[in-house]
Curated annotation (Swiss-Prot):
Name of this protein: Zinc finger protein 723
Record's keyword annotation contains 4Fe-4S: no
Alphabetic keyword roster: DNA-binding, Metal-binding, Nucleus, Repeat, Transcription, Transcription regulation, Zinc, Zinc-finger
The KRAB domain, residue ranges: 4-75
Predominant place of localization: nucleus
Family under the similarity heading: Belongs to the krueppel C2H2-type zinc-finger protein family.
Molecular function, one GO term: zinc ion binding
ZnF segments: C2H2-type: 173-195, 201-223, 229-251, 257-279, 285-307, 313-335, 341-363, 369-391, 397-419, 425-447, 453-475, 481-503
GO cellular component, one term: nucleus
Gene Ontology biological process terms, A to Z: regulation of DNA-templated transcription
Protein's job: May be involved in transcriptional regulation.
Encoding gene, per UniProt annotation: ZNF723
Length: 513
């Protein structure tokens, strides 16, 4: 087999055939031919620019108009070719009247496609040619390109019309293996290989296998850290070219994929597909272990790690591992001290967006999560979930080391440090380590000299809340407010005022007597 050329991927029309296409079909043809040429150049195929491409780039017709005369509109092709080949009417018309007509000259005796049917007998003559073509189309996916020129052209035209077919909304090609439907035969063919292919390309680093070498090569970059695709705008690099293309839309603001249901737009087609499931309620990704279903494949993968216990994302700073990359990214901020999310009300900053959302409720006083058992309300849903365990007595978090159980996962995590002796929260000022982040926060106040806890009674300030509570006891013992009437002393002015009422009543009773 010779090297690939532009001729192998090009479709040519005569003036007669070109005039038979409508404007949309002509524009589609231009786009497909230009795309095919660009793909060859991208693949490094040494091709000189064909005259056809030059014409199309300049917006000219794909031939020399002076060499052709206007001809009458051709007759309709035999009715047998209007059955079952393509369910979409637009594609059916285009293929029947143009593509088969164009390739009839290759000499297939039974396919007299340049001649329209004028009688029943003549129509019967074409029946044999149609049956043979139809048989080719129903062959196995691996053999479809071994059929004659007619089937090859048939497949090429289906691919070139992929965008047009998508707009019809018809999914007419169904996979017999899993029932999934496709709007294009080529997409079904590609999908069916997933059922038959063996993952024979194995990663030597981790053992993961892939069906095609290109996917293995992309995967290897996870281990090597290679990111050959760099954004010229901001310098960010990616290990897959498609990721770079998607990233570029951040700079351009382009969101070409629109939801017909609610009008929301997206910069990735996959994001639109995932979004649509919000409207349909579809959850196609099901966990075989527990039956839980998800609307996004990545969510299923993350969920599976609950069963396997896998935690592939490890912190280089302290060695702690996580089952999701987002959890690792959040954790890293403990070490860096980075706080991206700032409250506009008071200026306080947080390392997680969920934390600032919760914090804002301090200012608004909102407590949307209410306990049906006792009526107590909470700012955060997880606090309500934890609170409910007081009523149920549930303690689902058990220490494997000593068997002690807890009603909060955070309490178990804190408890485990007793066994490990780990102190992951380190003070950058003096190097002292702590087992809990809250303890580190309290410790930092020693260096800042900050005293946020103020006594309302005397105005004295303290750096710890517990110290303030101890101080308050002093005021409880003191009794600076003395009654002038009887000499009795009190530690609060409000109590003294209530006491004075006793003397007022006594005086009024004396006057009555």
């Amino acid at each position: 087999m010779g090297p690939l050329t532009f001729t192998d991927v090009a479709i040519k029309f005569s003036l007669e055939e070109w005039q038979f296409l409508d404007t949309a079909q002509q524009n589609l043809y231009r786009d497909v031919m230009l795309e095919n040429y660009r793909n060859l150049v991208f693949l490094g195929v040494g091709v000189s620019k064909p005259d056809l491409i030059t014409c199309l780039e300049q917006g000219k017709e794909p031939w020399n108009m002076k060499r052709h005369k206007m001809v009458a509109k051709p007759p309709v092709v035999c009715s047998h070719f209007a059955q079952d080949l393509w369910p979409e009417q637009g594609i059916k018309d285009s293929f029947q009247k143009v593509i088969l007509r164009s390739y009839g000259k290759y000499g297939h005796d039974n396919l007299q496609l340049r001649k329209g049917c004028e009688s029943v007998d003549e129509c019967k003559m074409h029946k044999g040619g149609y049956d043979e073509l139809k048989q080719c189309l129903t062959t196995t996916p691996s053999k479809i390109f071994q059929c004659d020129k007619y089937v090859k052209v048939f497949h090429k035209f289906s691919s070139s019309n992929s965008q047009k077919i998508r707009h019809t909304g018809n999914n007419s090609f169904k996979c017999k293996e899993c029932g999934k439907s496709f709007c294009m035969l080529s997409h079904l063919t590609k999908h069916e290989r997933n059922h038959t292919r063996v993952n024979c390309y194995k990663c030597e680093e981790c053992g993961k296998a892939f069906s095609v070498p290109s996917k293995l090569n992309n995967h290897k970059r996870i281990h090597t850290g290679e990111k050959p695709y760099k954004c010229e705008e901001c310098g960010k690099a990616f290990n897959v070219s498609s990721s770079l293309n998607n990233h570029k839309r951040i700079h351009t603001g382009e969101k070409p994929y629109k939801c017909e249901e609610c009008g929301k737009t997206f910069n990735m087609f996959s994001s639109l597909n995932n979004h649509k499931r919000i409207h349909t309620g579809e959850k196609p990704y099901k966990c075989k272990e527990c039956g839980k279903a998800f609307n996004v494949f990545s969510s299923l993968n993350n969920h599976k790690r609950i069963h396997t216990g896998e935690k592939p994302y490890k912190c280089e700073e302290c060695g702690k591992a996580f089952n999701q990359p987002s959890h690792l990214a959040t954790h890293k901020r403990i070490h860096t001290g980075e706080k991206l999310y700032k409250c506009e009300e008071c200026g306080k900053a947080f390392s997680q967006s969920s934390h600032i959302t919760t914090h804002k409720r301090i200012h608004t006083g909102e407590k949307p999560y209410k306990c049906e058992e006792c009526g107590k309300a909470f700012k955060v849903s997880v606090h309500l979930t934890t609170h409910k365990r007081i009523h149920t007595g549930e303690k689902p978090y058990k220490c494997e080391e000593c068997g002690k159980a807890f009603n909060q996962s955070s309490a178990l995590t804190t408890h485990k440090i007793i066994h490990t002796g780990e102190r992951p929260y380190k003070c950058k000022q003096c190097g002292k380590g702590f087992s809990q982040s809250s303890t580190l926060t309290k410790h930092k106040i020693i260096h800042t000299k900050e005293k946020p806890y103020k006594c309302e009674e005397c105005g004295k300030a303290f750096n710890q809340y517990s110290t303030l509570n101890k101080h308050k006891i002093i005021h409880a013992r003191e009794k600076p407010y003395k009654c002038e009437e009887c000499g009795k002393a009190f530690n609060k002015s409000s109590i003294l005022n209530r006491h004075k009422i006793i003397h007022t009543k006594e005086k009024s009773q004396t006057l009555k007597m």
